Amino acid sequence: MAAPVLLRVSVPRWERVARYAVCAAGILLSIYAYHVEREKERDPEHRALCDLGPWVKCSAALASRWGRGFGLLGSIFGKDGVLNQPNSVFGLIFYILQLLLGMTASAVAALVLMTSSIVSVVGSLYLAYILYFVLKEFCIICVTTYVLNFLLLIINYKRLVYLNEAWKRQLQPKED
């Protein structure tokens, strides 16, 4: 017996709009964070727009050891290793991946979206811990990306539940 063919299922409009808004914000914040990191490398005295006071300094957090490779990849692959990129590069890749995979309603895409969201939230919790307890700073850019990652987790969870229900309805035997 052949496997059942699932009809095309579309996601709700609110999900697409929310995903585009969150991913667009994430992409823009990642680009800005990358800019701040580069400027801080070029000029250590550079004051970014997100440096609002003595306790609110995004450039200090972004230029710290934990601003590259999550503070982990440098010790594994070397400070100049190809994988020891600024966290903003990983964020940019993540938000673009979320945006592109969000355009399809496949089961594999939904699982990749959910898995990558879980990883991003775990990473956000780790970086939030570093930000608060180690660096003792408040980075508005960082915290905003943590919130965006959590919102994407919710959006992806809702998508998985919605698609699962739609596919279940398609697979149920039709009663005449």
UniProtKB/Swiss-Prot annotation:
- Provide the membrane-side ranges marked Cytoplasmic in the record: 1-13, 103-107, 161-176
Task of the protein: Involved in vitamin K metabolism. Can reduce inactive vitamin K 2,3-epoxide to active vitamin K, and may contribute to vitamin K-mediated protection against oxidative stress. Plays a role in vitamin K-dependent gamma-carboxylation of Glu residues in target proteins.
Its activity is regulated as follows:
Inhibited by warfarin (coumadin). Warfarin locks VKORC1 in both redox states into the closed conformation.
Q: Which residue positions does the secretion signal occupy?
A: none
Q: Name one GO molecular function term.
A: vitamin-K-epoxide reductase (warfarin-sensitive) activity
This protein's name: Vitamin K epoxide reductase complex subunit 1-like protein 1
Q: Could you tell me which cysteines form disulfide bridges?
A: C50-C58, C139-C142
